[in-house]
């Protein structure tokens, strides 16, 4: 099945774009895709077809990102969650399982809070930095806010996220330029601010009341310094789980969409169709 057609809807002062396969025979829940900053529904072009035949799938685009990137007033992850929920309300989505890419995870956690446990019992976060930012990443977030250096900072980040693929990196740099300096600078500010406010995503997840099951799927880093704290957190919090997928990039939904989809389907079955948290 091909990607659904892009639709738009007016939410407040913003025209927001989204995909919806409108599968009427779908099993519960609807799968809702949330991209990272300066990304859009194309981020899920490999993952959506894996789920299209069984689930209703909706992919949300953030304000100012689609159908064509454009300037908007300032916003953060709280507004992203509000926009996503407004779209879901408008198109008649009741129970849903959100899936976020990278730092779309901040919006995913806020969306779980805003939607409540009756509608959103679980979430999947894809390759979200679970520890405090390293000095190098902190510097990169600052560089994104430099009108003279943001493009080079994007290029360096892309090399880190998908090494040994220079053609892909340059294609992403050209795509990055379409979103423009203001949006990339905003991403740096919001991501830095989120870590400053919450410490780590794991600490932010603990603020969800009542708790929801969240699964982290990632491939890198794979060293024990990164994985062990997640293992310890999972042992102390039964609602958190993780899976190390064994890939090489920051994009498991592009690199191994079948494995990501299998985790989504399994979590959906256990937490929605079975009606219990596991």
From Swiss-Prot:
Feature type site, description Increases basicity of active site His: 127
Coiled-coil portions: none
Active site location: 250
Domain AB hydrolase-1: 29-158
Disulfide bond positions: none
Reactions the enzyme catalyzes: 2-heptyl-3-hydroxy-4(1H)-quinolone + O2 = N-octanoylanthranilate + CO + H(+)
Sites where the protein binds substrate: 103
Record SUPFAM superfamilies: alpha/beta-Hydrolases (SSF53474)
InterPro entries cross-referenced by the UniProt entry: AB_hydrolase_1, AB_hydrolase_fold, Carboxylesterase_BioH
EC number in record: 1.13.11.-
Entry GO MF terms: dioxygenase activity
Similarity section: Belongs to the AB hydrolase superfamily.
Function: Involved in the degradation of the Pseudomonas aeruginosa quorum sensing signal molecules HHQ (2-heptyl-4-quinolone) and PQS (2-heptyl-3-hydroxy-4-quinolone) to anthranilic acid. Catalyzes the cleavage of PQS to form N-octanoylanthranilic acid and carbon monoxide.
Protein name (database record): 2-heptyl-3-hydroxy-4-quinolone dioxygenase AqdC1
Source organism per UniProt: Rhodococcus erythropolis
Protein encoded by which gene: aqdC1
């Amino acid at each position: 099945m091909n990607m659904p057609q892009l639709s738009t809807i007016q939410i407040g002062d913003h025209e927001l774009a989204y995909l919806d396969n409108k599968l009427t025979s779908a099993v519960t829940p609807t799968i809702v895709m949330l991209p990272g900053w300066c990304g859009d529904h194309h981020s899920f072009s490999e993952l959506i077809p894996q789920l299209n035949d069984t689930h209703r799938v909706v992919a949300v685009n953030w304000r100012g990102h689609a159908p064509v990137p454009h300037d908007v007033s300032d916003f953060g992850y709280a507004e992203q969650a509000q926009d996503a929920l407004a779209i879901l309300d408008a198109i008649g989505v009741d129970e849903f399982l959100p899936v976020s890419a990278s730092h779309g995870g901040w919006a995913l956690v806020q969306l779980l809070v805003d939607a409540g446990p009756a509608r959103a019992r679980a979430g999947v976060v894809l390759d979200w930095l679970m520890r405090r930012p390293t000095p190098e990443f902190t510097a990169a977030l600052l560089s994104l806010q430099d009108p003279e250096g943001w493009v080079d900072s994007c290029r360096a980040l892309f090399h880190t996220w998908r090494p040994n693929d220079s053609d892909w990196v340059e294609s992403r740099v050209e795509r990055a330029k379409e979103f423009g300096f203001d949006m990339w600078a905003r991403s740096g500010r919001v991501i830095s601010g989120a870590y400053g406010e919450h410490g780590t995503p794991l600490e932010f997840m603990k603020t969800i009341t009542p708790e929801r099951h969240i699964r982290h799927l990632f491939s890198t880093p794979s060293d024990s310094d990164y994985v062990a704290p997640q293992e310890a957190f999972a042992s102390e919090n039964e609602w958190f789980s993780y899976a190390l997928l064994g890939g090489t990039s920051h994009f498991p939904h592009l690199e191994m969409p079948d494995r990501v989809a299998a985790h989504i389907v399994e979590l959906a079955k256990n937490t929605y169709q079975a009606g219990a948290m596991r």
